[in-house]
């Protein structure tokens, strides 16, 4: 489809300014940037010709990965302010003809998110299949070196699998061990994510920048990757731009 300048969607022609709240502007002198600090700089951003503010994660988080480990998708971390502060920011941006796009991470959650806490609580938990749980390799005991379900190397360090000693099973985490991967094969997971996104859109958010969205679709066979250094393999061919990623994104757009 060809667009003219006049009818092109706003996101194709906007000037987007990313704000990393923690280091942008501190309003209360505690050494941490916050939403009220962002509010105080909107006139400056407007004068720069900014159309869209892209806000890096401000959700409630243990901050293991600078807010990309989300423990509550529908709340603001107290370090940055409150939901009321965010509502005020949305209104102030819209009053200036500007839009707000929020960073959103749905490949994984924090291990402190209620979804994972429930998933981890029992092998029979209704949310067990919301994450990727697997037993050790055939013929090996849980915790034994090399018993991880695959040889994939984490983006951070070590294996992508963390042993849960209580159940004897491992959970998948492409990033930090405190960032377990959601199982997008499960339609309940996708429905929960869609509902959360609608909640933010209803609150006035104009869109999302989807972090690491290209890794949400995994090869369900979970094959080993080629060993590139030491004992760990490169699993990226089995989870990057996976077989259902476009299906999931089209579904997200429809919902």
Predicted regions and their residues:
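Acidic/aromatic-lined carbohydrate-recognition and catalytic surfaces
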Residues: 2-198, 202, 215-255
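A glycine-centered loop/beta-turn motif at secondary-structure junctions
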Residues: 203-207
